[in-house]
Design a protein with these regions (language model features):
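Phosphate-handling catalytic cores of nucleic-acid transaction enzymes
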Residues: 1-190
């Protein structure tokens, strides 16, 4: 019996993207699809299958073909929680919190204690140009995403407008592409 990766790499073998790009796209996509439904127990902690992966390659190395190809498969399988192509830290947080609001009531504000603490907030950030999503030298946004990788509980966000949001068990997965030159623009030396 052949495993999924053998079958997927056979399916993508005639594309221009490398097998490595296709394999990592599949790993991230499967992890996003599984959400927090599976885990590995690690002492008192659980390790979930969400991954943060940046495919690095020169322009024209077909990173985007691997990323977009697996995202298309996820959509066909019914996966819906994809991040916007471009956003800010604040808007991204607000969008994740809104996943737990009543979409039929635009004035719906969750009251203290009404949030299901066992709910999860999965999201796949899939962008063939990482800098379009994260911005340049946006360490605050990247740090937030870093803190969410293994976050358990409800993450509270307070905004300058005195508004606040609650994000239960944020579970982001990241699959983005970048070139070495653009990577150095996003993460300049300190």
């Amino acid at each position: 019996m052949r495993d999924f990766f053998d079958l997927y790499l056979q399916y993508t073998k005639d594309t221009e993207a490398t097998a490595t790009f296709h394999r990592w796209s599949a790993i991230v996509g499967i992890g996003a699809y599984l959400e927090r439904n599976v885990w590995v127990q690690h002492g008192a902690s659980k390790i979930y299958p969400n991954h943060y992966v940046m495919l690095l390659g020169e322009s024209g190395s077909r990173k985007s073909a691997a990323i977009k190809g697996f995202v298309r498969i996820l959509k066909e399988a019914g996966y819906k929680t994809l991040a916007a192509e471009k956003t800010s830290k604040e808007k991204f947080s607000a969008d994740l919190a809104a996943m737990h609001h009543d979409t039929n009531n635009p004035d719906d504000d969750l009251l203290w204690g009404d949030l299901d603490e066992t709910a999860i907030t999965p999201i796949l950030i899939a962008n063939d140009e990482a800098n379009d999503f994260f911005g340049l030298n946006n360490i605050e946004f990247l740090s937030l995403l870093g803190s969410w990788w293994d976050y358990n509980g409800t993450y509270e966000v307070k905004y300058k407008t005195s508004k606040s949001d609650s994000i239960p068990n944020p579970t982001p997965s990241i699959l983005v592409g970048n070139t070495p030159t653009n990577f150095s623009l996003a993460f300049p030396p300190t």
